[in-house]
């Protein structure tokens, strides 16, 4: 039975000055038979204002308060007591270490770096941080065991109430020995072989054996597992910045920022695993910056070696869904004197609505079998980059519970061992099974067809659910139903497809795709390394030039436009496509395909072939032939190299927008060769080649944010109609699309050579955290720039006299086929008319500035279009002039020259205020 809860809350202050003390270490003590009173697992720290709250139900009643530069204070409570508004006074102390004396009293005012022995100490540690550790050796191998557990925290319910009574089987699995009662719901164990080579720098981790049981094995694993791996990835305190929780934290051993970013205090000399060590405490200068509080335990000799460290994420940091995150890491000395990692313990508490109830996560990693001498076989590092590469989970050997009892270096607790029984009982409960199925459907976008809606057991899943209903101007309400097979049906052969119907165009659409993978898969064809052959047939609506990888065209979110939509430039396209793809472990991949399409103009799009004829007087006459449709035969080869990337590919073969880490660079070179056949409708036919290159990378600036950068360039080498030209990616939805132009209309500009730049800087609260009042909102600033510079060569410009066979650029049909009716008296095209034109000499540019982390998941951006707010169109119209220049209200008349010939000018487009400026939102959960 659970014991009574003992709790206390209050403020810690300086006993002399009354100043509040932040970051005081507060923990309950527990009694042992041979060591007396020792720190328990129940602890916390005071916040920036010195406030604290702590409680436990394990029977602990002695509380310890410890602060750098102050005498330790102990407070005894009655078991079950609940005290509030307690003021705890700490007495300043002076710590001596040999001839070093540091007095951190009033540290905020008196801390100095110059002449500070703590600063000199950390400088010595930093200068020697690479000298004694295994990473300084030419090579090494080691074994590592890691265990990760997840637990539901603060399980305080009345099991006798009607609602909870049906879940009362959980009660026997509740662990009451911690701060709050919790239930362990998932365990993951890995045994790895780790390899390291210094020159050239290479690291590899091979997952030898694994065991996953519990809730994690029930939910859709894909991106969930990848994100968990990224959150709990290995970190090295010797690096200048530490990659944790999808952010960069300044390391207390940073060679560039440590001394200016942190304040250091010598606390005492203590014994750590038999070594006399200096306890060096540190706190960030700004508690809301991306840094740590903690302790470094430095061997007290001339080597300045780090024996152990304990770091915590400050509670005031601008971090979502994490109320506690700490890492404790220790080193051991090998026989040759080299220091190597010994054990790492990572603890985190995640929450959704408040930080009292949430999910506890704990990972323990133990290193053994260090070998610095045996040569590493060459094939171990074959085709690998300098980045760590982990084998696909499906290659790991799986062992039963009995075998793991002999493999793991330390046993599971009773509660960890009971997870299997808990899950077995939970999955038999209809209410819990329905909840798991609902969560799986929302996160995976698919609904399983098994009775229990278990994605791991289903042979066919319906989805994506967010594409079942959508809307667009051409189709009206679009209804779609589809799905995909899973590895439960066949682990190498997969099929997927859909049928769709528009209530306005009344045309059925469909897709049927077959995939054969050369390797066996455990869920879908794109998990792990991709190596497959894929064939598909599809008939659907497309908008020329628009890439549906940004957001699927019939996604429900794409149905919400920023303004009243016009009839789209669209086409009905039939595809018959075959594709081969091979991806290697170093993230080099090759993809080849052949695609036959039949393209039929739809909406207000027309394929109007333009021919020019020179007249006897050397003038030119223009004739137009309606092509209607054309056939296209296209081959493609794509090479991509993304060293160190961990990218989740969804069931449609599209990169997930929740893609894990984006730090790895991506280089992509694509070449298309094709033949556009329009001869059956009076066209000329075109052979074309098009080449594109893309570079994508996230650049981190330690705790000061990061820059997401994409550079893209391409060229069409031969003459071809506008459907083969480059048309920048655009977004007409109210939702912000990154790496697309949000204030440009679809197909507004045409080009056959271009360079595009997309850059977004995330400040991560760097500036806003320093503004009083604003910092309480936890907002984060973000700015972006998107620009494209390009051109249209003469061979692909249908408006140049003598350029025959090309298609007229798309435009809303003029009234009565008269171009003049589409323009006002000043030569500007009227609202409601869409046109495409060659891009001019200036680059197109737009900028955004906004705030993210509004209510933790909303981002709002103001967008401004910088260029092409008033520009020339390729259409010639007759100039209009006032009938009476002195009284324009009398009307206008067509202008003629002195010979009575019409005065022709280029029409213009003027972007209105709503076109130049916009506001868009994004829903984005981030830590």
Language-model features: locations:
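A short, amphipathic beta-strand motif
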Residues: 6-14, 50, 88
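Structured interaction patches on ligand/partner-binding surfaces of diverse proteins
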Residues: 44, 71-86
């Amino acid at each position: 039975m659970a014991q009574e809860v003992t709790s206390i809350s209050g403020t810690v202050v300086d006993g002399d000055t009354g100043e509040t003390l932040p970051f005081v270490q507060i923990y309950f003590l527990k009694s042992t038979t041979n060591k007396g009173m020792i720190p328990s697992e129940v602890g916390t720290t005071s916040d920036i204002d010195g406030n604290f709250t702590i409680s436990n139900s394990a029977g602990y009643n002695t509380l310890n308060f410890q602060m750098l530069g102050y005498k330790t204070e102990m407070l005894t409570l009655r078991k079950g007591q609940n005290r509030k508004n307690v003021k705890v006074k700490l007495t300043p102390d002076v710590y001596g270490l040999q001839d070093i004396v540091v007095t951190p009293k009033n540290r905020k005012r008196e801390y100095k770096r110059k002449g500070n022995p703590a600063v000199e100490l950390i400088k010595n540690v930093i200068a020697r941080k690479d000298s004694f550790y295994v990473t300084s050796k030419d090579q090494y191998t080691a074994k590592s065991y890691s265990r990760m557990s997840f637990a539901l925290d603060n399980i305080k319910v009345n099991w006798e109430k009607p609602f909870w009574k049906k879940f009362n089987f959980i009660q026997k699995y509740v662990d009451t020995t911690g701060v709050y009662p919790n239930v362990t719901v998932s365990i993951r164990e890995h045994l790895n072989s780790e390899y390291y080579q210094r020159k050239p720098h290479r690291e590899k981790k091979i997952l030898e054996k694994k065991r996953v049981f519990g809730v994690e094995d029930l939910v859709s694993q894909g991106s969930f597992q990848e994100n968990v791996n990224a959150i709990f990835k290995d970190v090295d305190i010797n690096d200048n910045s530490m990659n944790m929780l999808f952010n960069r934290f300044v390391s207390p051993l940073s060679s560039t920022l440590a001394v200016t970013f942190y304040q250091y205090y010598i606390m005492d000399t203590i014994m750590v695993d038999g070594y006399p060590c200096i306890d060096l405490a540190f706190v960030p200068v700004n508690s809301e910056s991306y840094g740590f509080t903690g302790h470094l335990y430095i061997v007290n000799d001339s080597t300045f070696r780090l024996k152990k460290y304990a770091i915590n994420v400050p509670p005031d940091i601008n971090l979502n869904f994490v109320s506690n995150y700490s890492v404790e890491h220790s080193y051991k000395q090998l026989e040759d004197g080299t220091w190597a990692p010994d054990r790492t313990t990572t603890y985190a508490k995640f929450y959704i609505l408040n930080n009292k109830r949430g999910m506890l996560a704990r990972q323990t990693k133990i290193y053994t079998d260090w070998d610095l001498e045996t040569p590493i076989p060459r094939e171990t590092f074959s085709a690998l980059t300098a980045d760590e590469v982990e084998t696909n989970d499906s290659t790991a050997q799986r062992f039963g519970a009995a075998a793991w009892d002999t493999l793991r270096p330390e046993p599971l607790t009773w509660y960890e061992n009971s997870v299997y029984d808990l899950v077995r009982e939970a999955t038999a409960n209809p209410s819990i099974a329905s909840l798991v199925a609902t969560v799986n459907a929302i996160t995976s976008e698919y609904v399983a067809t098994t009775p229990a809606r278990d994605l791991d057991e289903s042979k066919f899943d319906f989805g994506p659910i967010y594409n079942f209903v959508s809307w667009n101007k051409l189709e009206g309400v679009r209804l779609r139903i589809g799905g995909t097979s899973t590895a439960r049906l066949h682990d190498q052969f997969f099929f997927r497809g859909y049928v769709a119907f528009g209530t306005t165009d009344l045309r059925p659409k469909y897709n049927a795709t077959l995939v054969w993978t050369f390797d066996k898969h455990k869920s879908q064809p794109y998990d792990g390394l991709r190596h497959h052959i894929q064939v598909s047939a599809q008939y659907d609506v497309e908008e020329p030039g628009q890439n549906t990888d940004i957001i699927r065209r019939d996604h429900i979110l794409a149905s919400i436009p920023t303004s009243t939509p016009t009839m789209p430039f669209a086409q009905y396209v039939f595809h018959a496509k075959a594709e081969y793809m091979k991806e290697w472990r170093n993230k080099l991949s090759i993809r080849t395909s052949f695609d036959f399409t039949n393209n039929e103009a739809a909406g207000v799009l027309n394929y109007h072939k333009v021919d020019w004829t020179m007249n006897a007087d050397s003038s030119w006459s223009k004739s137009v032939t309606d092509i209607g449709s054309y056939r296209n035969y296209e081959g493609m080869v794509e090479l991509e190299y993304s060293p160190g990337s961990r990218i989740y590919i969804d069931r449609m073969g599209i990169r997930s927008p929740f893609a894990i880490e984006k730090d790895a660079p991506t280089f992509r070179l694509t070449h298309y060769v094709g033949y556009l056949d329009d001869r059956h409708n009076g066209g000329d036919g075109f052979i074309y080649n098009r080449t594109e290159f893309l570079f994508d990378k996230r650049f981190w600036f330690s705790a000061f944010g990061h820059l997401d950068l994409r550079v893209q360039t391409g060229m069409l080498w031969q003459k071809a109609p506008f459907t083969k030209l480059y048309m920048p990616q655009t977004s007409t939805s109210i939702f912000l699309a990154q790496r697309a132009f949000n204030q440009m209309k679809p197909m507004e500009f045409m080009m056959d050579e271009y360079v595009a730049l997309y850059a977004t800087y995330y400040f991560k609260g760097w500036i806003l955290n320093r503004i009083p009042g604003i910092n309480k909102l936890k907002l984060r600033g973000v700015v972006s720039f998107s620009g494209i510079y390009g051109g249209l060569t003469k061979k692909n410009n249908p408006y140049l006299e003598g350029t025959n066979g090309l298609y007229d650029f798309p435009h809303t049909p003029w009234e009565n086929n008269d171009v003049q009716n589409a323009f006002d008296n000043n030569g500007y095209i009227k609202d409601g008319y869409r046109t495409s034109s060659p891009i001019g000499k200036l680059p197109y540019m737009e900028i955004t500035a906004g705030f993210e982390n509004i209510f933790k998941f909303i981002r709002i951006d103001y967008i401004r279009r910088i260029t092409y707010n008033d520009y020339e169109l390729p259409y010639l119209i007759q100039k209009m002039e006032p009938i009476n220049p002195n009284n324009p209200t009398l009307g206008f008349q067509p202008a003629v020259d002195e010979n009575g010939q019409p005065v022709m000018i280029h029409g213009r487009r003027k972007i209105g205020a709503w076109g130049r400026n916009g506001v868009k939102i994004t829903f984005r959960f981030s830590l």
